[in-house]
């Protein structure tokens, strides 16, 4: 009995020491984090951008898709249980309905906002990319945060002094929804150089949740991009990582432009895939029957959205917003932001495909 008590004491003391050591390490890491003020972002040169790509690609043979292969869903053929092969058709049917239900107003800046401009929104999104890199957050967290911002601004008027508060609080909510170990409120106060208090962020969190009616799982372009990218790789004998990173880059670029709000997330995802295939193989038609079947978009349906992303890629729009561009110039993302592209999109690429 005495031995058991002694062992218990030893275990308790050991556990206490381990806990104290972990807390000290966390405090040290928090102290080392750089405070980031929204207005200072263009001058930041040493902000951390070290989210390691953990996606592992499984090698598989490449075959040219035929009409017959359309009957065999690529998700059903996948050996990844997370793809939910048996239910994928129903899941994506639901997501297509949900994206329409949860979309923001396409002209909320003109109709709802009095103090916020499209340029302010772009600067905010660019800053949130820096925040996501600083805390090594998932891309889904960033997409959700931006969607919460657009949805909230479609419902409530916000003055420009509180726009950053809306952005950082949206990132907090998205982190809680997506991340295993999300940053806490103090972290988000710190990253804004204590521009806002903990109480202000908590109050804004409640306001956002009530305005969105606690509906936080809305699909984003990243939701559809995963599946569309898999289809796009079926007839490409090239690095799958390069295709994935380029599609992700184009999709993230779209968030900078307020005009992207008028497109459904699935439209943005399909347009990113379309333009990525054009960039990689400019002499080949970027669309095919298989992509048309899975995305439910014809090439002509994507013309306006593809043109918008193409302008963003060439820095014709939002050229001063560099966070996403610098992020994808890194070798860990295959430097996809530096890939050359034609300054003009031939009209022939938007013709319907018959084979």
Swiss-Prot record:
Keyword set for this entry?
Cell cycle, Cell division, Cyclin
Q: Name one GO molecular function term.
A: cyclin-dependent protein serine/threonine kinase regulator activity
Q: Name one Pfam family in it.
A: Cyclin_N
Q: Which PROSITE patterns match?
A: CYCLINS
List the InterPro entries: Cyclin, Cyclin-like_dom, Cyclin-like_sf, Cyclin_A/B-like, Cyclin_C-dom, Cyclin_N, Cyclins_cyclin-box
| Residues annotated as signal peptide | none
GO terms (BP aspect): cell division; mitotic cell cycle phase transition
- What protein family is recorded? Belongs to the cyclin family. Cyclin AB subfamily.
Matching entries from PANTHER family are given as: CYCLINS (PTHR10177)
Q: What name does this protein carry?
A: Putative cyclin-A3-1
Source species: Arabidopsis thaliana
Which gene codes for it? Answer: CYCA3-1
């Amino acid at each position: 009995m005495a031995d058991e008590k002694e062992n218990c004491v030893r275990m308790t003391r050991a556990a206490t020491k381990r806990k104290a050591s972990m807390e000290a390490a966390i405090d040290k890491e928090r102290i080392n984090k750089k405070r980031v003020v929204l207005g200072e972002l263009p001058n930041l040169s040493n902000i951390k951008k070290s989210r390691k790509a953990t996606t592992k690609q499984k090698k598989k043979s490449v075959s040219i898709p035929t009409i017959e292969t359309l009957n065999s869903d690529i998700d059903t053929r996948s050996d990844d249980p997370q793809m939910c092969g048996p239910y994928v058709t129903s899941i994506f049917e639901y997501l297509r309905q949900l994206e329409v239900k949860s979309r923001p107003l396409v002209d909320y800046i003109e109709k709802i906002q009095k103090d916020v401009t499209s340029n302010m929104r772009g600067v905010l999104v660019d800053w949130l990319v820096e925040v996501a890199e600083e805390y090594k957050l998932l891309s889904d967290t960033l997409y959700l945060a931006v969607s919460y911002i657009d949805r909230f601004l479609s419902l409530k008027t916000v003055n420009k002094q509180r726009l950053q508060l809306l952005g950082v609080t949206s990132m907090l909510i998205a982190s809680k929804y997506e991340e295993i170990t999300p940053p806490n409120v103090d972290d988000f106060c710190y990253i804004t150089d204590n521009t806002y208090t903990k109480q202000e962020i908590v109050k804004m969190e409640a306001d956002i949740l009530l305005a969105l009616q606690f509906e936080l799982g809305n699909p984003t372009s990243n939701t559809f991009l995963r599946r569309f990218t898999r289809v796009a790789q079926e007839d490409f004998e090239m690095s799958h990582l390069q295709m994935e990173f380029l599609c992700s880059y184009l999709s993230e670029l779209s968030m900078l432009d307020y005009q992207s709000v008028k497109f459904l997330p699935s439209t943005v995802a399909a347009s990113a895939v379309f333009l990525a295939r054009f960039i990689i193989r400019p002499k080949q038609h970027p669309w095919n029957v298989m992509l048309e079947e899975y995305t439910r978009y014809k090439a002509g349906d994507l013309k306006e959205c593809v043109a918008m992303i193409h302008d963003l890629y060439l820095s014709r729009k939002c050229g001063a917003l560099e966070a996403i561009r610098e992020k994808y110039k890194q070798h860990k993302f295959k430097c996809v932001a530096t890939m050359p592209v034609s300054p003009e999109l031939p009209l022939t690429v938007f013709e319907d495909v018959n084979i």
